[in-house]
Amino acid sequence: MGRIYLDYAAATPLDERVLQAMMPYLTSEFGNPSSLHAYGQTARTAVRTARRQTAASLGAKAQDIVFTGGGTEANNLAILGYLRANCPHGGHIVTT
C-alpha cells in the first residue's frame, strides 16, 4: 500500500522539478540577497528572477509578488493587508 499523508498544513511533498531548480541555491549559490558582496548579488538576481517567473505564471506584476519566510509571516501579511484596505480608522485585532 502506498503512503497516505493527510497533514499538508504542516508539511507538503516537494515537486522534483522544484527541488532541481532550487538545488544550486541550497548547495553552492546561496547568499543573503540583502548583502552587497558577490554571493548576495547572485542571490538577489535569483530572487528577482523567481519573482518575475512567479508573476508571469500568475498573470501578476512582479512588484506585487512578496516572498515570506514562512506561514506565520504570510498570514500576518495577509491580515495586515486586509485591515489596511478595509479598516482605515485603526483599531485592534488579536490573532492566535
Where are the language model's segments positioned?
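Pyridoxal 5′-phosphate
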Residues: M1-T96
